[in-house]
Design a protein with these regions (language model features):
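A conserved pocket-lining segment of Rossmann-fold NAD(P)-dependent short-chain dehydrogenase/reductase
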Residues: 125-127, 139-162, 166
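N-terminal Rossmann NAD(P)H-binding glycine-rich loop of SDR-like oxidoreductase domains
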Residues: 1-23
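Non-catalytic, hydrophobic alpha-helical segments
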Residues: 12, 54, 167-171, 186, ...
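Glycine-rich Rossmann NAD(P)(H)-binding loop
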Residues: 153-158, 184-191, 205
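Conserved beta-loop-beta element that borders a ligand/cofactor-binding pocket
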Residues: 87-90, 95, 113-136
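Mobile cap/lid helix-loop segments that border enzyme active or cofactor-binding sites
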Residues: 191, 198-253
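Glycine/proline-rich active-site loop of Rossmann-fold NAD(P)-dependent oxidoreductases
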Residues: 135-142, 146-148, 174-184, 207-209
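NAD(P)H-binding glycine-rich loop region in Rossmannoid oxidoreductase-like domains
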Residues: 22-86, 97-106
Length: 253
């Protein structure tokens, strides 16, 4: 089965392409690097010809509110139009747990707008909602670090991050099964408060910064409540724990 992966050269996309190949599918990595541009439409018709499934794991180059909204809306509209023309039977998109819970967050708003376009199209679809990735833990810590570099501030909101490999596996699973015409939520196996998680994580990383609990610390511009970033209903729990993932990642360097 031919499956096109939009964003197929990125962190999650490259893993998705590799896993699809392992299962014997014809996986096409589509990105500007390979001549496919979902904003201009360049290369979409050629990439989608003969495809059964299109997976979108692409990300916006800018997270500025207007830019990120324009990216996801334009990219998604162009993909859906090209899929309809090519007879693609299943659109799979990776999104975020909690898109509907942080309306003041420009990135989350843009992802929710993307989902609404997919839901309103004629293409059968599956949306995979994932929690935050282990791979981004250092960047999240840096985003709330004090100017003096000695502390990191974190709210006590619940946090249930997941390994990129497990996200890719969930996306692949959705792509080879029948369209959900709905969404599935995936999360890591461990749920902790953010402050507790980051104390453990920074210690494991050998990062000496102190983690200070602050309920008003903003997560990329948004103040969180307890359940902003975690599944509140049924979810598929991944297997890889952060400590195990970090050990493998460190050993692989």
């Amino acid at each position: 089965m031919k499956i096109v992966v939009i964003g197929g050269t990125g962190l999650i996309g490259s893993k998705v392409v590799a896993k699809l190949g392992e299962f014997g599918h014809e996986a096409v990595a589509a990105s500007p690097k390979t001549g496919v541009n979902t904003i201009t439409g360049e290369g979409l018709a050629e990439a989608f010809a003969g495809a059964s499934v299109v997976i979108d794991v692409s990300n916006a180059p800018s997270w500025e509110d207007t830019a990120v909204m324009e990216f996801f809306q334009t990219s998604t509209r162009n993909q859906l139009a090209a899929e309809a023309a090519a007879g693609v039977g299943h659109h799979v998109a990776l999104s975020i747990v909690g898109t509907e819970r942080l309306p003041e967050n420009g990135y989350f708003r843009a992802k929710l707008a993307q989902e609404k376009l997919i839901e309103g199209s004629s293409i059968p679809f599956s949306i995979v909602h994932a929690t935050q990735f282990f791979e981004f833990v250092p960047a999240i810590a840096d985003s709330t670090a004090a100017a003096d570099g000695g502390t990191v501030r974190m709210p006590p909101a619940l946090f249930q991050p997941i390994a990129g490999d497990d996200v890719a596996q969930a996306v692949v699973r959705a792509s080879v099964e029948s369209p959900l015409n709905g969404r599935v939520e995936v999360a890591g196996p461990e749920r902790l408060s953010m402050d507790e998680f980051f104390r453990n994580a920074l210690s494991a990383l050998g990062d000496p910064r102190e983690v200070v609990t602050d309920p008003h610390t903003r997560y990329y511009g948004s103040e969180l409540d307890e359940q902003s970033l975690v599944p509140v209903g049924e979810a598929v729990l991944a297997e890889i724990k952060y400590a195990d993932w970090l050990g493998r990642t460190t050993a692989g360097k």
